[in-house]
Design a protein with these regions (language model features):
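Cytosolic regulatory regions built on CNB/CRP/Popeye-like sensor folds
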Residues: 1-174
C-alpha cells in the first residue's frame, strides 16, 4: 500500500512483497532468484551471490504512469528494471528510455545528493529495489557488482561527454 516503507524517501505507490498483486505470481526467494538471473547486471554471478542480492532486496510492481523518482528529492533506493520500461527526464535530456536490465538511483546513494532525474514508468514495471543500507552491504559482499556498476557509469559519462561536445559544436549527437 501507500505506506509501504516509511523510511524510503522515494514515495512510491508500491506493492511490497507482502501484498503482492496476482499478476506478479509467487515471490518466494526462488522466484526472486529466477528474476535476477534474467538481469544482465548479474549475469555470471554465483548462486550464493544472487542469494545475497535476493536477501538484501525486494521486488515490487509499479503501474504505468507512476513517478518512481522525482528530480531534486532525496533518494534512498537503488532500482534495477526486471520487466518494463521507464522514461528518464533530466534538465538537459528529455526522455532517455531505460529498459529491462538497466538500473537507476545509484547516484544519490553514492554521493548523497538529491535525485538527478525524474523517472516515470512508461509501462507496468517489475523492479528490484535495494535501500541505502543494503546497497552498501551488497557492494561489500559482491565486488563484481562494483566493477560492473563502475563500468556502466563510465559508459554513461562518456555518452554524456559526447552529447555535450555535440551540443557545443552545434551538431546533434548520433
Amino acid at each position: 500500500g501507500m505506506d509501504f516503507d516509511a523510511r524510503s524517501a522515494d514515495r512510491l505507490p508500491f506493492h511490497d512483497d507482502d501484498e503482492v498483486t496476482p499478476a506478479l505470481g509467487p515471490t518466494s526467494s526462488d522466484a526472486r532468484l529466477r528474476h535476477l538471473e534474467r538481469v544482465p547486471l548479474f549475469s555470471g554471478f554465483s548462486e550464493d551471490e544472487l542469494r545475497r542480492i535476493v536477501d538484501r532486496s525486494r521486488i515490487v510492481e509499479v503501474a504505468a504512469g507512476t513517478v518512481v523518482t522525482e528530480m531534486g528529492e532525496p533518494g534512498d533506493s537503488f532500482f534495477v528494471i526486471i520487466d518494463g520500461t521507464v522514461a528518464a527526464r533530466t534538465p538537459i535530456g528529455a526522455g532517455s528510455e531505460l529498459k529491462p536490465g538497466d538500473f537507476f538511483g545509484e547516484m544519490s546513494l553514492l554521493d548523497g545528493e538529491p535525485r538527478s532525474a525524474t523517472i516515470v514508468a512508461s509501462t507496468d514495471l517489475r523492479l528490484l529495489v535495494v535501500d541505502r543500507t543494503h546497497f552498501w552491504h551488497l557492494l561489500d559482499e559482491t565486488p563484481d557488482l562494483i566493477r560492473r556498476i563502475l563500468t556502466i557509469l563510465s559508459r554513461r559519462v562518456r555518452r554524456l561527454e559526447q552529447t555535450v561536445h555535440a551540443i557545443l559544436r552545434g551538431t546533434s549527437p548520433a
